[in-house]
Amino acid sequence: MKETAQEYKVSAVIPTLLKNWILRVVYATLDHIPPFVWEILHVITDIYFFWVQKLINYVRPHSRVIYYNAIKKLDECDTYQMWCQQASVVDEITGANLWRRNFFSRRYDFNSVIEQYSILENMLREEKYDVVKEKFSTTGPCMLRNFAGIGDKKLFTKSLMGTKLLIEQYLTRILEGLDILNNQTLTPTSFFQRCKLSLGTTALILQGGSLFGLFHLGVIRGLLLQDLMPNIISGSSMGACVASLFGCLSNEQLKQLLTDDNLLNIIKNDVDLLKSCGYGNLEQHLNLGTLIQNLIHHGYSQDVYLFIRFVMKYIVKEKTFEEVYQITGKVFNIVIHPTDKSCPNLLNYVTTPNVLIKSAIECSLGSGVISEDTSLLCKNLENEIEPFLNINKNKQVKFLTPENANNPSITESPYTRLTELFNVNNFIVSLARPYLAPLVVNDLKHEIKTSKYYYYKHYPNMPPINANTVRKTQRSSSQSPIKAGTVEDLEPEPLMSPVPPSSAVNDSAEYIIPELGIPQLNFTEMEPLAFKFKYHLERKLKNIATMEFRHRMEVLDNLGLLCSLIKRLIIDEKTPRSATEIAVVPRMKSLSLTRIIEGQLNNIPYWIKSGERSTWPALALIKTRCAVEFKLDDIIRARRSR
């Protein structure tokens, strides 16, 4: 029996030794490959993709080449204003600009929107501000984030420029009404506070990012520059580090830090910080084998580790959650995964006001990632640093990484706790994983990019209506609850001069829609049946493949068959995942293996720009859902400062 046990131990040790020996050989081989070999491989790869693209353009029809060239220029835009100009060109090519001008859609109740718009317009014109206050607070639906379905994602996937112009003008009227009420001295601050309580709050969730965590910086910059950044933010792992950066600095300081290469220059000037993170001489060539070994065994690329050290040294220092909240007024949360359930899993200025932010970041990253001795620290009444948990429990508590943590129930989820504490009912999720971008079901993907089947050039044949019919229709519509004169004022002006596609010029005459009593371009969302079936079949198959892939990975993880690297790439914490959430995901074009492995310093501005560009297509949806909320925040903040 003893010999059998010894043979079993030997047979179990041999594969492990063989595996370690093979890995050492691979790492040593990669370390000794000259740098010019990698440069030659990069040149060969660039040449290959260049000629492949040339061949594809040669085979495509000329009209398709024009379309793809317009889409390609979107990726070359450096500012949001440039992106909007190019997006308007794409909308003209696809006919989406005409779709925006048409009120009709099955996705929202446009009749209810027109009715509320008409009532609000009349009350503001007649200066009946008491009635407007009632519409905002008690009798009206203006303080609903998704009133009549105007927040449906499908309304934001047709046009790159945004949604229906009717929805945009409706929200503009609400904002104008709030400004007018704010200027009225008889309107108390409590009125705006009740409106805000009814509407709810938005939170930004920064999920993970051990490899692409710097992407979160670009998402924050993109939202800040458009004044769409929520005041509540939550993060785990690398997202906790970025959330701490946001919470400790004012918005103006953040804009300055994330502009140009300011962040990179601060890091470059600290030679001690660079050396402690393994950079040494900036001109020194980094050994590829050593970098891959760090990436696999420690789970963080070198540039991400450098940023974590920078935040701890320059930003959070020895500050606590309450101290930071008193300075900036921002609510930032850090999610941790302790093995002891008596320890809170959501840390902020309410639940753990005296906890050191630095220790919270280390616990969110996980025990043994940054330091072996990971524990929560806090300040006592004498301003001395001591363990947050008692000594006996502190020795036993371990903090798990997000991929190794057991998924809590809905009642124990930190995001449920976030909703309870701060009335959060709208989430923006930043998912720093480019390789999962095609598999994210609730990501905002524009159909003109993911599919070429939706073109708004096919209109039903309707006979033109002469002027007598127009006057007759307008007289009949004047007897309806919605006055014809009011609705005529509602006809939206296009943001750009619409250029109908050539195939629709002869069919795009103006007709009268009896329900509205105003001229409208004669087209709907009805596409040719074959195109529509093909698109929906493709979308359904993709959703099925996504759910099947996620299910299989979770089963393998529960059985313990996934290695640590695969778990780090695929398995993560359960963040809010529903049809109402907005997910911002890096594009697959942003995925660069050489940048991940080498971890060069220029990765920081690269990922900031990549994250900022990824937010641009989602800004229209974010503005629709959050514009009224942010206006109320501004009004309340201004009144309190008086």
UniProtKB/Swiss-Prot annotation:
Enzyme class: hydrolase
Stated consequence of mutating S237A: Abolishes TAG lipolytic activity
Description of activity control: Loses its lipolytic activity in cells lacking nonpolar lipids.
Domain PNPLA, chain residue ranges per copy: 204-392
Active site residues per record: S237, E403
A GO BP entry: cell budding
GO MF annotations, alphabetized: lysophosphatidylethanolamine acyltransferase activity; triacylglycerol lipase activity
A Gene Ontology cellular-component term: lipid droplet
Location of the region described as Disordered in the Swiss-Prot/TrEMBL record: 471-502
Annotated catalysed reactions: a triacylglycerol + H2O = a diacylglycerol + a fatty acid + H(+); 1,2,3-tri-(9Z-octadecenoyl)-glycerol + H2O = di-(9Z)-octadecenoylglycerol + (9Z)-octadecenoate + H(+); di-(9Z)-octadecenoylglycerol + H2O = (9Z-octadecenoyl)-glycerol + (9Z)-octadecenoate + H(+); a 1-acyl-sn-glycero-3-phosphoethanolamine + (9Z)-octadecenoyl-CoA = 1-acyl-2-(9Z)-octadecenoyl-sn-glycero-3-phosphoethanolamine + CoA
EC numbers for this chain: 3.1.1.3
Alphabetized UniProt keyword annotations: Hydrolase, Lipid degradation, Lipid droplet, Lipid metabolism
Sequence motif GXSXG, residues: 235-239
Stretches with biased composition (Polar residues): 471-481
Location in the cell: Lipid droplet
Short motif HXXXXD acyltransferase motif, span: 298-303
Record-linked InterPro entries: Acyl_Trfase/lysoPLipase, NTE, PNPLA_dom, Triacylglycerol_lipase_N
Known function: Lipid particle-localized triacylglycerol (TAG) lipase. The lipid droplet/particle is a lipid storage compartment which serves as a depot of energy and building blocks for membrane lipid biosynthesis. Involved in the mobilization of the non-polar storage lipids triacylglycerols (TAGs) from lipid particles by hydrolysis of TAGs, releasing and supplying specific fatty acids to the appropriate metabolic pathways. Also catalyzes the acylation of lysophosphatidic acid (LPA). Important for efficient sporulation, but rather through its acyltransferase than lipase activity.
Further comment found in the protein's record: Present with 3210 molecules/cell in log phase SD medium.
Protein name: Triacylglycerol lipase 3
